[in-house]
Amino acid sequence: MSHEIMRLSAFAPAKVNLFLHVGGPDGEGYHPISSLMVFADVGDRVNLQPADAPAFETSGPFGDQIPAGGDNLVVRAGQAFHRRLGGPVPPYRLILEKHLPIAAGLGGGSSDAGAALKLLRDALAPALSDDDLEALAASLGADGAACLRARALIAEGRGERLSPAPRLPELNAVLVNPGAPSPTGAVYRAYDAGVHPDGAAMPPMPDHLESAEEAAAWLAFATRNDLEAPAVRLEPHIGEVLDVLRGEPESLLVRMSGSGATCFALCASDIEAEGLAERLETMRPDWWVRRCRLS
């Protein structure tokens, strides 16, 4: 093992749930889900650098809003990796450039942790298998393994049963966050207060979808986000974002991602997504707005 860590950097993409079906809690309090997850070309970045002593730092527009101690998933990823190696490691610094909003339904913490795990494997244990790395990611949270893979997939069970997604067309989208956090635990508790006859059943999946229009039509007809209504009840600003997006001509499908508060609009093309994003930035400069491509 080298006595000094090499300098490395990894992108941590935003996760978007195109649909999220949720069942009632099981005996241990976990909710079964089925979800089609895709990943955006916008996200955070994690940097690994040599250091005289172990350190974790944050930067970026949302860097001052995240915990720097053991509650941060990047720190926990490092701790889990050290336990897996079982021996001393050279000191290093992890720097999280936080560009995604906090508690936003974009899997940011899990994606950051996945990026950190990849960097640590590259620097310290390149022989560590993908399965071992995925087990570490899964131990950090329900989205951990999915965000480590960072490609379109179907998640079922508690989020741990992953399978390839059907072939998807190019999906251009606009992500919008109203600047209000939507804590996952609170949204699930609000969900549990209701009645949910549909449960987490997986809809029949087409083999492939030829266009963004076809994908949006199928998603609107066959799927939903079961956490959207309880999240809107808790945070009305989410409902405001959804209403605005649904009133825009470029929007093929409008939905909340994960437990919110970020919402997305699928658009027919990159040009339409760009136009929608620019208009929203002018209309609502207080909102976080990003045009992106999903895959």
Swiss-Prot record:
Active site per the UniProt annotation: 15, 143
Q: Which reaction does it catalyse?
A: 4-CDP-2-C-methyl-D-erythritol + ATP = 4-CDP-2-C-methyl-D-erythritol 2-phosphate + ADP + H(+)
Specify which residues bind ATP according to the UniProt entry for this protein.
Answer: 101-111
Give any GO molecular function from the UniProt entry: ATP binding
Q: What class of enzyme is it?
A: transferase
Biological source species: Caulobacter vibrioides (strain ATCC 19089 / CIP 103742 / CB 15) (Caulobacter crescentus)
* HAMAP family given in the database record: IspE
UniProt keyword list: ATP-binding, Isoprene biosynthesis, Kinase, Nucleotide-binding, Transferase
A Gene Ontology annotation in the biological process aspect, one of them, is: isopentenyl diphosphate biosynthetic process, methylerythritol 4-phosphate pathway
The organism's taxonomy opens as: Bacteria, Pseudomonadati, Pseudomonadota, Alphaproteobacteria, Caulobacterales
> Can you name this protein?
4-diphosphocytidyl-2-C-methyl-D-erythritol kinase
